[in-house]
């Protein structure tokens, strides 16, 4: 009987893409579990603790249920519980009197890998320099908070995130952006993986600094320009392979393990939109172009 329980517990192992199911605002989380069915269970999580990829503070399996807890960045205790339902996880998160429900599916294997075989298609402009055509607010009912001025797309700093109407899979993305002192933004590629934008000239590189794959891959060097100067991103995404060139300097070349906190759609095997984060400080964008990559 004990062997059967251990085998059942091991089914929690792996990476899970999670959708919160009882909120009007779409949210996606990510969970990794290792060692379930042994005495050395551990895990990592992207979600409500603060948007980082956090090591799970306490995790265990009890009576066929996976359980883990956090004390989040506001000092609030959170309890997560999940059970297997066929190939899915069905779970809850309790925080005081609030309860959220969620569903997890196994993160997909994505076969596409970057290399010389990929060919560039037609380059398209995603921003016409005059209007918000092709873009929409990510949160329904929330004020947009963006305007177009002098050929640039500008956020006041308390704006709705913007996302493209179109969805994309493998591509090269070029854009120019400008941030003010202490400002913070981000670019969501496929709407799931955030490339950080931060005013951090002269600071050490890190997983939350400019050029990072947010909370996952730190830039190799700090290639940022001072606040108020226009900067460039050239981002290449093929499958899970990502390359980030900041101001002409390659700062990231790696493999994306899973979702970051910008994600609202957990369907990693599907194309997704480009997202511009507008709620963390003033930021401007211009000359946004995308080139599809195909074989």
Place the predicted regions along the sequence by residue.
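Boundary at the C-terminal end of the N-terminal hydrophobic targeting segment
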Residues: 5-8
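Carbohydrate-interacting regions of secretory-pathway proteins
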Residues: 10-295
